């Protein structure tokens, strides 16, 4: 019986490490994006630019990123809906199978 607990404990630990790894990879990816953003900003900004021109570039970039965030939110909602539909279908199939098995 203790080996079952050990297996469960190790499986939970493995899953926790997997989540931590994914979280860390996300942080690396996010920070790389920030570096790229700053590189892009440095490419656009020139020494002879006025303060208003620089602000215009930043506002434009901000609007672009806000649009991307909105697109990702919409995509996440669509994926969540698809997952719910699949879960519902699996439940239906499971119930049908139980009813079929019960009749035999």
From Swiss-Prot:
Keywords: Coiled coil, Cytoplasm
UniProt keyword Coiled coil present: yes
Annotated signal sequence range: none
Record Pfam families: DUF496
Domain of life: Bacteria
Gene Ontology, cellular component aspect: cytosol
Any coiled-coil regions, as ranges: 7-34, 76-96
Location within or outside the cell: Cytoplasm
Family: Belongs to the pole-localizer TmaR family.
Function: Pole-localizer protein involved in the regulation of several cellular processes.
Protein name stated in the entry: Pole-localizer protein TmaR
Upper lineage: Bacteria, Pseudomonadati, Pseudomonadota, Gammaproteobacteria, Vibrionales
